[in-house]
Structure formats: structure tokens, C-alpha cells
From Swiss-Prot:
Zn(2+) binds at residues 259, 262, 360, 419. The gene is hisD. It comes from the Bacteria. Belongs to the histidinol dehydrogenase family. The active site is at 326 (proton acceptor), 327 (proton acceptor). Catalyzes the sequential NAD-dependent oxidations of L-histidinol to L-histidinaldehyde and then to L-histidine. This is Histidinol dehydrogenase. Its cofactor is Zn(2+). Pathway: Amino-acid biosynthesis; L-histidine biosynthesis; L-histidine from 5-phospho-alpha-D-ribose 1-diphosphate: step 9/9. Keywords: Amino-acid biosynthesis, Histidine biosynthesis, Metal-binding, NAD, Oxidoreductase, Zinc.
Amino acid sequence: MSFNTIIDWNSCTAEQQRQLLMRPAISASESITRTVNDILDNVKTRGDEALREYSAKFDKTTVTALKVSADEIAAASERLSDELKQAMAVAVKSIETFHTAQKLPPVDVETQLGVRCQQVTRPVASVGLYIPGGSAPLFSTVLMLATPARIAGCKKVVLCSPPPIADEILYAAQLCDVQDVFNVGGAQAIAALAFGTESVPKVDKIFGPGNAFVTEAKRQVSQRLDGAAIDMPAGPSEVLVIADSGATPDFVASDLLSQAEHGPDSQVILLTPDADMARRVAEAVERQLAELPRAETTRQALNASRLIVTKDLAQCVEISNQYGPEHLIIQTRNARELVDGITSAGSVFLGDWSPESAGDYASGTNHVLPTYGYTATCSSLGLADFQKRMTVQELSKEGFSALASTIETLAAAERLTAHKNAVTLRVNVLKEQA
């Protein structure tokens, strides 16, 4: 089905509707699973030596120093334009402002007289950031990960990226106070961060996107007792646009294409109650696609994408919630009025002047988002992902006495005698002191 095929949602059967909202299949093949498992075990056992071997094998690079020196980072900074540096600074300021506002006030309450309960936050002590390499280095992801890590107060923030590391990534790391950067990529980088090597420190939590091997490595280390926690499950990029007859077709098309160009497994969907809008967007997509340098990749993504005509905007919202997009763009006359009805989306963009690109780079929200339907249970990355909550309770004698019989009754009902005894012993001491 080509992208310019306009589909009438209400003419489809329930099964056809289900098929329309299916995402491109992703699964780690058995060979990827086995390969990644071998890489993890090898790096855990042989450390830096294994990292250098994998760099030669996969990156075709001889790495002498795994850690990037301060001189190399300074040289990278010198090679970048002032314009790009200024743009990064503006983006960091926006990200910093939004994520600082996410700080939670401490909770401190008396649940009843003499029973004080608190909730406090503490930073994750050490985090590792993974940034893919390639022809289009994702330096913006450095800003999105390192900025909240700094605000949260993480004591150790390190970064891994395949060699040779782009100047933009090195400068972004410096700008955001990343302490150490390492010339290591792929599943072996995830292994190094999870287990530690002679050069790369073991971290508590790993963040960042990657290919199928990186994604599988993150999954595996998160399930190993000696591994590390991870940010969230990863999948291909996606966007869903809700547009009415008042939307600008060229704007809608540009937003769809900006997501489709990420890769052939990306998916874009347009929902509109206006069939003419769907037709005009399809025409605009074809015009703009012809001008894109990544047109071939983008066209592959469009093969799994949809133009869907609905009964009304309420049905658009219903379908969007069923799909749960990573990015949701609402280009309608009264876009904000639809927000209360949205239950599942990674990040929402309202109105003609809120392109997804703004959130990808500089509006301040985080561009690390749940994909592949995980918006039903997962949230966009935020300050909380770099922190942990801890509860504190303190009972006075009076507070303990008031709760004692309740605790004893509940513990006895669950047949946890030692739990009950921990209370009864104290009750008896209080009786003796009386």
C-alpha cells in the first residue's frame, strides 16, 4: 500500500483497522541474541583487550587510547563554528529550564499523630550515555541526556560512542559537563558500561539509542544481576498527526517527512476527518520528498505509513490513543482542546508553529521518548529517570502505640509471626516502662 492511498477508517472491518495500526515488525534474531551474549561475556572477562578487538572488527579502527583526552576535546571545539556552538547553548538553556522545573518537593507528612512519613529523592550515582556514530552524529541526544543528569546531581556521567567520535558529540559532552568520553561503540560499549573494564567505569544505569545490537545488549544487561538498569525499551521512530481542514498541508507533510527520514523502519500516520486534506498532504509529501537528500530511505518508511480519513476529530483522538504514538502532532483550529482526551503519547505538539523538530532540539522537552506502543505504560525521559525516590518513617512512642494493635492484627492474618513479634516485644517494653 503506497502512502498516497487514502483509507476510509469507517469502511474498514475491525481486523483491517487493527492491521492499519500495526507497526513494522522488530525482533532480535537468534543470531543477534547469541552474538550480543558472547560480546557481553567476552568484555566482562577480558575488558579493554576485548573492546579493542571489537573496534578493529566492527568499526575498522585501531584504538590505542580508549579514553578521549582533554586535548582532543579542545581541538574538536576549535573546529566547530561559533554559530553551532551558540545554537547548542540555546538548546541546553531550554532543556535545563524545563528539566529543572521537574524537581519534586520533598514529601513530609504525619499520617497520624506521632507517625511521620517522608519521601526524598536522591540521584542515580553513576550513569552511562551511549551515542551512536555514523554519518549523522546525534549530538542533540548528548544534550538531552547529559543535561538532566547534571541537574539530578549524578556524581559520575560518562559517554561512549563509536570511533572516530564526531566533533559535535565531543563538544556537546564538554558543554554538558560529561566527565569522561570513551572511543567504544556497539554492544561492546554497553557491556563496558554495565560491567566495567580497566578504562571504562561500571555505571548504575545506561541511557541512549542504538542499532539492533545495542538495543539487544541493553535488554540483556538489564536482566542480569551483575548488569545495569536502562532508560526504556527502544523501537523505530514514529509520528502521528491529527489535522483538520484548517491545517496547512505543507506543514503537515514536512512533519511527516521529518520523522520518516530517520530510517526505513520509521512509521508516520495522518488522521483527518477531511478527505481533501489527506489528498493535499499526499501531494505535498511527494513535492517535498523529491528535494530530500535522504529520499530513498524516507520513501521506504512511507511504505509502512498511513493516510486515514475519520468521521470526526473525536474519532481521531480515539484512534491515536489506541496507537499510542511516540510523537503526536495536533494541527487543528483548537488544538489544545484535544489534549485532555489524549491518554497515550510520548510528546505532543500543538498548533501550526510547533513542529516536531522543536522538541527534537530546542523547545526544552526531552526527545528521548517511548516508541512502539510503550506510551501505554512508559513516559518521556525526564529528571526522574536520573533519580530514585526513598521513603523515611519515624514513629514516636505514642505513634507506635496507636498503630501497634493494627500491625499485630495484619501480621497475624498473613501468618508472619516474626513481623508480629517485632511489634509485640516493643509493646511489652512500653508496658513495663509505664
